[in-house]
């Protein structure tokens, strides 16, 4: 903000990048912005980062809130190893801006790309991935936050099998009192295949079990190589769930606040649950036992994150002393702000305060407006492959070091995913 920026053309858009960074590759683009990979050319090791440009921040209030939510939560969760780390924030012209730049940890791919590669994953991989997701969720939930959009595409993975949760734009608070959850159902566009049945059926309350259901869907996808509930639409999605889990009992149905939804479920033929052994005959029985607990239809009977971490399937990784909780509850009070100018001020303050924190120096009193320079064209993502290794002398000895690798030797070749970090 207080120095001249380099200008690059990324996905046909101009990106203004801090002068000590060189953009090296386009990574992904989506409805909310674009992402590129860059290197810190001023440092000895030339560390790599992902730079996300969130666009059209003030075109709609829902996008403004989403951007602010993402920034605040990334900062709040910055200290956990299984949540993507934010390094820096930037706004080019603080007096008139519609974009925010986020400098983040660069990860090689996401879990969606790994699964889609079609190459074999081992049970040891499944254990490690699910354990890391649950560790991240424990930290998130302890701050009274529900992620609400857990899916393989929002789980970033490095070559050493280190996994990190990203994309908090849809997150909300998890108070049992609906009045304390501003906008809980607003913008609920989480991917249908990982959406909990209580969301689809309008249960009378929502809580952390929403994320637990998504973890179950992810485990099933790891076991089978394809989504378990691949619904084409709302009704098809619900029917797939009921076909697998069976007809819910009357006590569960009583929690559905929508009378029409209750009537629909009751109108269907009674179905018995299909054992997960039928879907995954070669799977570890302990994995299937955990899966059944993660995918309990009734959220009140669904396993909690803490209990899931203690499940025998994850025993090789579980260490209560190494599974921290967040030291403070996240403040969602900004969700009540409706004035666009006030939201703009809050975003600017958030960026300035974080920049001050990471630089350990005062705010620039008069931040200068960027002077545009000729844009440099950036190479597009070439979909180059890389390996996720799982060779190690001991799982258990490496657990404390968070070196997520394995005794057996296996390499996962997969294509880079264009939408990672986006």
Curated annotation (Swiss-Prot):
Compositional bias ranges of the Polar residues kind: 364-379
InterPro entries according to UniProt: Kinase-like_dom_sf (IPR011009), MAP_kinase (IPR050117), MAP_kinase_CS (IPR003527), Prot_kinase_dom (IPR000719), Protein_kinase_ATP_BS (IPR017441), Ser/Thr_kinase_AS (IPR008271)
GO biological process, one term: positive regulation of calcium ion import across plasma membrane
Domain Protein kinase: start-end pairs: 21-314
PANTHER family to which the protein is assigned, alphabetical: MITOGEN-ACTIVATED PROTEIN KINASE (PTHR24055)
GO MF term (any one): protein serine kinase activity
SMART domains hit by this protein: S_TKc
Binding site for ATP: 27-35, 52
Regulation: Activated by tyrosine and threonine phosphorylation by skh1/pek1.
Motif (TXY) on chain: 186-188
Function: Regulates cell integrity and functions coordinately with the protein kinase C pathway (pck1 and pck2). Involved the regulation of wall architecture, cell shape, cytokinesis in exponential and stationary phase, and metabolism of ions.
Enzyme Commission number, as recorded: 2.7.11.24
Biased composition (Low complexity): 380-397
Highest taxon in the source lineage: Eukaryota
PROSITE patterns tied to this protein: MAPK, PROTEIN_KINASE_ATP, PROTEIN_KINASE_DOM, PROTEIN_KINASE_ST
Biased composition range(s): Basic and acidic residues: 411-422
Family named by the database record: Belongs to the protein kinase superfamily. CMGC Ser/Thr protein kinase family. MAP kinase subfamily.
Class of enzymatic activity (EC top level): transferase
Domain notes: The TXY motif contains the threonine and tyrosine residues whose phosphorylation activates the MAP kinases.
Record's GO cellular component terms: cell division site; cytoplasm; cytosol; mitotic spindle pole body; nucleus
UniProt region (Disordered), positions on chain: 359-422
Identification of the protein by name: Mitogen-activated protein kinase spm1
SUPFAM superfamilies: Protein kinase-like (PK-like)
Reactions accelerated catalytically: L-seryl-[protein] + ATP = O-phospho-L-seryl-[protein] + ADP + H(+); L-threonyl-[protein] + ATP = O-phospho-L-threonyl-[protein] + ADP + H(+)
Record's keyword terms, sorted: ATP-binding, Cell cycle, Cell shape, Kinase, Nucleotide-binding, Phosphoprotein, Serine/threonine-protein kinase, Transferase
